[in-house]
């Protein structure tokens, strides 16, 4: 029934007028709410006639002087207070909250906002209108007036998701103040997590883990199927490490992903080049013995057999985790995280003994050095020569590359002897010895004539021209004492140990030397230092390389080479000194080989200008040299370090220096010089004293 019908009920007219004049919010007592029952689902379709109790009569005209807005405020406050006492706090089941909720006060519609809970409590409809709007609306719609009791008595309506979405998605208009806070009612929407308009920014779901065992490993390394099961054990560890970085990988943090992969690929792009070489190493046998393991010297260093083996050795360090291999693998990983390219160069230096051992083993297998049986029949028709080498480095490379080269004069002598013996079916035998070593290091057979048009770059010095092949037979150290008794009649009856390069040994004397070499029980040989000379050769080769563009784009110049002996340049210097002339260029060049005259030579290796000026200040004392200071008797009582220092580098006492210079100037008058004093004045700067300045002022 409507509110107007309620006022016409006779039972309600017994109340006095004073009670009717009392505001409604003060007349209603708490007992009147006892009859209000919570609506159930069966009462959803109920209408206004389903109310459980009657309200006191209400006359709009009598109470027109009471503000409607105040009455609504009081009624709503009591309703909320009574609802709180009866039903307690309204707590929803689902306590999840969306951090990106829309403000529930956005809606301007007077429709009810529902709270879905277990008890299905009736939703409260709030009136957000201002007092003026409410009065105007009530005056216009007085016959169809709706009281707060009719609204409160209506059963709770189950709002659908679509309705809630519509009400919640309403945007607050510009300039609208927020509604007042109602006590006992929270301002959060519940059970709207899955609503499309209230969704937070989408959270990316973690993708499925990547199978590194089949995708990344095969693409990065190109490992063939016939290799050992190397990276199977490591795939699990890398798989776990990669899972920690999957969410960052999709956010653009690629460095973390690369870091996790760096543990698998120790050498980065270099490993891709190593993959195809491994099957070749396992499948290809060693080169044939008759063909030799090296071929040409330059080709051997690039296409030789040991390089694939060294690559497979390096790959084995990464695929195995047993014993010392684990330590080497961790060492390479640490180096790769800081820098990737220097790993290969460093490993090549560290694995050099392994490479040298392979070279040495192949040489011994091929040549059968130091044979047990000596065939003297071939020695009867052979010619013997003594070869003197400047260093054992050249002996090492001669054994390694099976070549030799002598001076121009020595090459011609050996070439003529080889051609002569080749027609007769004989051989050329060479006894090798290093200058100053005190022993012979072996014997080799000359195999080919001298090739004057070919030059090898493997020697420690670049002055040698031409080459010929040799075959080493004996490699052992035989002291000179065992051979010193052999005299050579064709060399002023000197001992064979006192021979010059390419000195021919008569046949009978040569056979005697050969027998001693064969029967001597040696304890040392150049093979003992083979690894040392291999490393030294690598250093020399790297220093001789032309400038290359490094990764920074700059030219990296090679290390300066040691000064080599040049016979033609030495002859020119000797001829120039013999003519007695001295140019200004040599005067300023200072000490060294260019300053041939011992009277004017500066200290060995010292600068030219400063040294010559000191020589001039000392009056060119020809009796002094830079080596005199080394042989003085430092233990004698007459030795004075300070005075001795002053005699060489100039005294600190000007008086002594003045006397010393005057004495030496007297010697210059009687000394023959190969240059004039005017030339000296051109290249020497004098220091003017106060006396000189006074004299110049007097004559000017």
Swiss-Prot record:
Keywords (A to Z) from UniProt: Cytoplasm, RNA-binding
Bias (Polar residues): 23-39, 62-72, 114-125, 147-168
Knockout or disruption consequences: Results in fusion of the adult Beta lobes in the mushroom bodies.
Stretches with biased composition (Gly residues): 589-608
One biological process term in Gene Ontology: mRNA destabilization
GO cellular component term of the entry, any: cytoplasm
Chain intervals with Basic and acidic residues compositional bias: 300-313, 324-339, 568-579, 624-645
Any one Pfam family match given in the protein's UniProt record, by short name: YTH
Subunit structure: Interacts with Fmr1; the interaction is RNA independent.
The name this protein goes by in its record: YTH domain-containing family protein
Organism the protein comes from: Drosophila melanogaster (Fruit fly)
Gene name tied to this protein: Ythdf
